[in-house]
Amino acid sequence: EKFEELNLKAAELAAKARDKFPQVMIAGGLPPQNLVYEVDNRSDDEIISDFYDQAKILSPYVDFFNLEVLSSFREANLAIKAIEELKKPYLVGLHVSSGNELPSQEKISEIKSNMVLNNSLGLMLSCISPENYQLNSHELSKLGCPYGFKLNGFEFTTPKLSYNKTYSNGDSVNPNLILGKRED
């Protein structure tokens, strides 16, 4: 019920930061619109609508969109479709839970044949382990677009039933308790 209010507040704060530091580009974060670290199996229309609803609130205040921690090529392509009419550049953030596969079991090596990245600012692997960074950096270097990584400190990001149940129930729990905290 506070969706619009909180997104608008975040956008207004970002605009203030841009006013103070005009050389900084402001990203409008568009995370998974359902659960994170797992495939969104809802209908295309529902996913597109959810991404668009958030993007249209943020759009007047941001320079680009950050499509973040997406778990399948389908979800990423639907997010891109949702923001097309807003005419903003975007950064695509895909998640790799382990090895070189997204939670959808699609391989990083399949990006070129499943996504069009030429209109993007680039690609990043979001919320991945240092090990997954090492496993995937060479593959991303072959894409012909800017790329990067956002590392996290969890032991794993393959959700357990308790993770999904916690968030489905509307409960809030420290993710370190469910996903494990790395000690290195």
Locations of regions flagged by a protein language model:
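Domain-level signal for soluble alpha/beta catalytic cores
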Residues: E1-D184
